[in-house]
Every structure is written in C-alpha cells, then in structure tokens.
C-alpha cells in the first residue's frame, strides 16, 4: 500500500512539474501572441494594460485569459467585431504602465472604445503605502476617462494580503477621484473562499487558471455591462 501511495505521489508530482513548466513557457508564448492586434478590425477597439494576468498567464491559451474573455463578451453583447490591442507585459508594475504602456496607448491611431487596467499585484512584493499611493495617483491621472481599473488582487493571508487590501483601497479611491471606473476585483476573488487555491490557480499557485480567469472576467464584465449599455 505504501508503494502504491508513493507511486501515485510521484505521478502527481510529475504532472505538477510539467504544468509548472508550461506556465513558465507561456510567458514568452503569450507575449508573442499579443505582440500584434488580435480579433477583427473595423469594429470596437479594446485596449488592455497590465501585467501577466492581462497576458493570460495561467490560462490554457492566451485568449482564455480574462482579456480574451472580455473581448468575446463584447462580441456577444454587441454583435460587432472586436479588435484587441494588449499592451500588458508579464512582471509589470505600475511604473511600467506609466513608462511604457501608456505611451503605447497614446500612439494608437484609433481611439479605444474600452480600456481595462489590472496592475499592482507585482507591486505588493515590495509594498510601501506612500510610494504605492503616489504611483497610483500618477497612473489614474494619466488614464483616459472611463477606463476600467481593477483594484489589487486578493492574496489569501499574511502580510501580502494586508498590503493588498490597503492597495485595493488606494486604487479604488484614486480611480473614482480621476473619473475612472473601479472594478472590485479584490472582493470578487475574496468571495471565492480558500477553496479557490485548489481550483482557480495554475501550477505556480500565483496566476489564475482558466476558471480563475473567468472570475477576473466576471468582475470586469459586471462593471462594464452596468456602466455602459453599448456593451450589454
């Protein structure tokens, strides 16, 4: 019986290791996928800013991340073509959005119909309230009015979660102050409970899997569909 249990454990470990490698490899693969506009030109333009979550890391395919899911819901809700320009980068922090992604957004020839931002998760690792608050205010002041801004992700427990909860408050308040549309991502993820760790995360236990990305998309879509009847 012990030998059988050990064999099962070894198999499970091997499967986990393979999936972990797949997550790591998806960073370059997803960046290549999103390096060009995706979808159909001539209709709605959706621009995404953010970090690896916006890149779809953890999902089985790049377009099964929350950005791809939002794009599909825009198609379904409007009956129109949707083109996605995904300017996010894995590992990005708020400073990277300010330095690189916002200038790229400003250089687009077509004015976006919808812009989403999910950033701040990587800033939690070296969180300082004053620094984060200043960066958040700079970001929200520079974003187009009406941009959908997610607050910080939920980190389950410990210091990171305490910092993330505070960061979420700062993001929400700053978004409202600058005429943006805050998305309550933190509360949406928290509502999934501890079971989400087993069912909604990729093998690295950091990025959302397909199911987790659907939760992210749901949080955004609830806000989008309520705020703009063009998309519902």
Region annotations inferred by a language model:
Residues 1-48, 59-60, 75-76, 110-111, ...:
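N-terminal secretory targeting modules
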Residues 100-232:
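Alpha-helical cap/lid subdomain in secreted, periplasmic
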Residues 53, 66-74, 139, 171, ...:
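Hydrophobic residues within alpha-helices
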Residues 22-27, 45-47, 55-134:
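Conserved SGNH/GDSL esterase-like catalytic core that processes O-acyl groups on lipids
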Residues 51, 89, 152:
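Cofactor-binding loop segments of dinucleotide-utilizing enzymes, especially the Rossmann-like FAD-
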Residues 54-55, 190:
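Short, acidic Gly/Pro/Ser/Thr-rich loop/turn segments
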Residues 52-54, 209:
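Ser/Thr-glycine-rich phosphate-binding loops at phosphate-binding pockets of nucleotides
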Residues 39, 59, 63, 77, ...:
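Alpha-helix initiation/capping motif
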